[in-house]
Amino acid sequence: MTQKGSMKPVKKKKTEEPELEPLCCCEYIDRNGEKNHVATCLCDCQDLDEGCDRWITCKSLQPETCERIMDTISDRLRIPWLRGAKKVNISIIPPLVLLPVFLHVASWHFLLGVVVLTSLPVLALWYYYLTHRRKEQTLFFLSLGLFSLGYMYYVFLQEVVPKGRVGPVQLAVLTCGLFLILLALHRAKKNPGYLSNPASGDRSLSSSQLECLSRKGQEKTKGFPGADMSGSLNNRTTKDDPKGSSKMPAGSPTKAKEDWCAKCQLVRPARAWHCRICGICVRRMDHHCVWINSCVGESNHQAFILALLIFLLTSVYGITLTLDTICRDRSVFTALFYCPGVYANYSSALSFTCVWYSVIITAGMAYIFLIQLINISYNVTEREVQQALRQKTGRRLLCGLIVDTGLLG
């Protein structure tokens, strides 16, 4: 009896953890896993205090401290929402604010337009190499692309259409082209062909869950040079895929080592590769495209090419309509470089500035489209081209525009 009585306290122990309380609209779980409130966004930031102290005392600030400050700001920048405050990705904000400002400033004078329109690609390339070097995902370029489409269409409706040179049919064609671009981008943003691990029992993940897991993986590896952002994406997939991974190849040990992905714990099939930015393997991976913030692989390559083609056609058509309105009786090519009186009024100056901005963006997209067509004709992917250049096994043709890898025919 005494033994049974002594075991009673053991039975009373609770093994189940208490359920988490629901979050109010201003509460959230921060990157440390603790409950926080948006009202305390300016409180208890040791890294920011240290940075201000070092700035006041004219001392140098370590890059790691700057990264921690930016991570803290990014984590605390939230808006109240149902069931908890939602995080706002700060990389989407600069295009929304700076693009209209730059374009309006560029329309004040011809020289200002030259300076601004020259500096915009330079700043975009600088930001690209900065994020590419750190192997981070960013919504900056996706935000820039979508907002550019919307803002160019807005300027067209406000400044070009009222002049009476654009008919209803032409406006309808341009509008349909814009919607087709958005549909193609939506298709290209879907699963590019992620590989699944047969040994994993995880269920399929949605695109939003995959993006969330990728962000968690990035937060875990920030500040550690050379760390890959696989994070919690290992052994996970966005789609149940029977072609996900192959068995161990029967070739040489070197070949088996090359095909094995230590991050995803699977054997990659031919032409698949692990994306260090997305943190997962992709079938027939071509490249990671910052304009869609996703990889381009087997499943979305056609949609990516289609989006580029529709964008080029729509952009050229919109540029032609605008120049025909503000620079009458001149060819499109002549009006680009010689349009007398275009800066006489602000409306035509803004339209002309937006035309040149569209020309710059269109030229960049045309280059990407041309490279894609060349790679398709040579039956190679962009990753295979870059790998051949690094290993010095490829031959440059046509001033480097074409690269013959010598691997696939």
Curated annotation (Swiss-Prot):
It is a multi-pass membrane protein. The keyword Signal does not apply. The keyword RNA-binding does not apply. Residues 215-255 are annotated as: Disordered. It is found in: Golgi apparatus membrane; Golgi apparatus, trans-Golgi network membrane. Residues 1-87, 133-136, 187-302, 353 are cytoplasmic. Keywords: Acyltransferase, Golgi apparatus, Lipoprotein, Membrane, Palmitate, Transferase, Transmembrane, Transmembrane helix. The chain crosses the membrane at residues 88-106, 110-132, 137-157, 166-186, 303-323, 332-352, 354-374. Its main location: Golgi. PANTHER family: PALMITOYLTRANSFERASE ZDHHC23, ZINC FINGER DHHC DOMAIN CONTAINING PROTEIN. The DHHC domain is required for palmitoyltransferase activity. This is Palmitoyltransferase ZDHHC23. The gene is ZDHHC23.
